[in-house]
């Protein structure tokens, strides 16, 4: 009798990708963080999409919409906590993934390493844009904290921050 994980068409896909993965037997658990990054990213996108369906960014109703998500939406509290903690887990996995690459000397593969550096910059830019979305779903505090380092640049710091903010539109508790 054959094993169901090798005969069933759908389970066979999962088996080939996770269980019978053609990888060396001496591979360590440090090599899981790339896959964990993908899982964290999918969780962030899905929970963010569902949270955005219920959130309002107006200063008068933003807090009420968050309490509505936590109290009235089915498992809304779970969506909120998964989204908040998923962002932290994403960056923890990202830095551990980079640390594993440094430890095992992956920087010697310059083309692959340079693509990873570009992806790191893209992740940082995406995280920033997620905080200062044109929709107005981020706080004045978030925009100022993230861009605060740029304001320390002599002569052009203040103008650079205003340019990144898109002018003087950052002025309320939420960016609407």
From Swiss-Prot:
Binds 2 heme b groups non-covalently. It is found in: Mitochondrion inner membrane. GO terms for molecular function: metal ion binding; ubiquinol-cytochrome-c reductase activity. Its cofactor is heme b. Heme 1 (or BL or b562) is low-potential and absorbs at about 562 nm, and heme 2 (or BH or b566) is high-potential and absorbs at about 566 nm. Heme b b562 binds at residue 83. InterPro entries: Cyt_b/b6_N, Cytb/b6-like_sf, Cytochrome_b_N_euk/bac, Di-haem_cyt_TM. GO terms for biological process: mitochondrial electron transport, ubiquinol to cytochrome c. GO terms for cellular component: mitochondrial inner membrane. Keywords: Electron transport, Heme, Iron, Membrane, Metal-binding, Mitochondrion, Mitochondrion inner membrane, Respiratory chain, Transmembrane, Transmembrane helix, Transport, Ubiquinone. Heme b b566 binds at residue 97. It is a multi-pass membrane protein. Belongs to the cytochrome b family. The cytochrome bc1 complex contains 11 subunits: 3 respiratory subunits (MT-CYB, CYC1 and UQCRFS1), 2 core proteins (UQCRC1 and UQCRC2) and 6 low-molecular weight proteins (UQCRH/QCR6, UQCRB/QCR7, UQCRQ/QCR8, UQCR10/QCR9, UQCR11/QCR10 and a cleavage product of UQCRFS1). This cytochrome bc1 complex then forms a dimer. It holds the Pfam family Cytochrome_B. The chain crosses the membrane at residues 33-53, 77-98, 113-133. Component of the ubiquinol-cytochrome c reductase complex (complex III or cytochrome b-c1 complex) that is part of the mitochondrial respiratory chain. The b-c1 complex mediates electron transfer from ubiquinol to cytochrome c. Contributes to the generation of a proton gradient across the mitochondrial membrane that is then used for ATP synthesis. It comes from Nyctinomops aurispinosus. This is Cytochrome b.
């Amino acid at each position: 009798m054959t094993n169901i994980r090798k005969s069933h068409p759908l389970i066979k896909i999962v088996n080939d990708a996770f269980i019978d993965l053609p990888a060396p037997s001496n591979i360590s658990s440090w090599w899981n963080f790339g896959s964990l990054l993908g899982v964290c990213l999918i969780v962030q996108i899905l929970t963010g999409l569902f949270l955005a369906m219920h959130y309002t960014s107006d200063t008068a109703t933003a807090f009420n919409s968050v309490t509505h998500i936590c109290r009235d939406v089915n498992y809304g509290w779970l969506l909120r906590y998964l989204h908040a903690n998923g962002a932290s887990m994403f960056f923890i996995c990202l830095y551990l993934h980079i640390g594993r690459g440094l430890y095992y000397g992956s920087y010697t593969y310059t083309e692959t390493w340079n693509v990873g550096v570009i992806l790191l910059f893209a992740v940082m830019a995406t995280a920033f844009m997620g905080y200062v979305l044109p929709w107005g779903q981020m706080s004045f505090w978030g925009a100022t904290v993230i861009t605060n380092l740029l304001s320390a640049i002599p002569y052009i710091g203040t103008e650079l921050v205003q340019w990144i903010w898109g002018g003087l539109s950052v002025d309320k508790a939420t960016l609407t």
